[in-house]
Amino acid sequence: MKILFCDVLLLSLLSSVFSSCPEDCLTCQERLHPAPGSFNLKLCILQCEEKVFPRPLWTLCTKAMASDSEQLSPADPELTSAALYQSKASEMQHLKRMPRVRSVVQARDAEPEADAEPVADEADEVEQKQLQKRFGGFTGARKSARKLANQKRFSEFMRQYLVLSMQSSQRRRTLHQNGNV
């Protein structure tokens, strides 16, 4: 185990001394010939520069570059696809919440709509607000609050304007009636 660890360490040190990570990742991409969109070049570079750990994609690249042949052995395509899809899986972590949302939607659809009670509507509202909070739906609440504040501000402005215009018209009438105009 120590020998394997030392070999990997030596290989990573040599690769960082004699080459650059973007070139190595481009070479790796050419040698592996992955499906379009399955090879993430940025992730490979980050793994090469040891900024991301674990590094399944980069270890696959070092194996591919270490081999003299242009193609990998028949046993390695499984390893190739596993490493490539593992990097994609790390990008898809946010999709773990989808089953919870799906179950809420299915439960809501399963309820009979004809027998809807006000209590059920309130429960749906509470559930919807919780989902809205959990999945970042705050913008709608903020937007409506801003809209309401703008309406209040505008109505206050209009009220002041109307009061001033009424006072102004009353002054004109009184001045006109007194003959001061």
From Swiss-Prot:
Q: Where is this region: Disordered?
A: 103-125
Please list the residues that make up the propeptide: 20-95, 174-181
Drop me one GO molecular function for this one.
opioid peptide activity
PROSITE patterns, per the entry:
OPIOIDS_PRECURSOR
The protein's location, in the record's own words, is: Secreted
Q: Which GO terms describe its cellular component?
A: axon terminus; dendrite; extracellular region; neuronal cell body; plasma membrane; synaptic membrane
Extent of the signal sequence: 1-19
Protein name stated in the entry: Prepronociceptin
Gene name in the database record: Pnoc
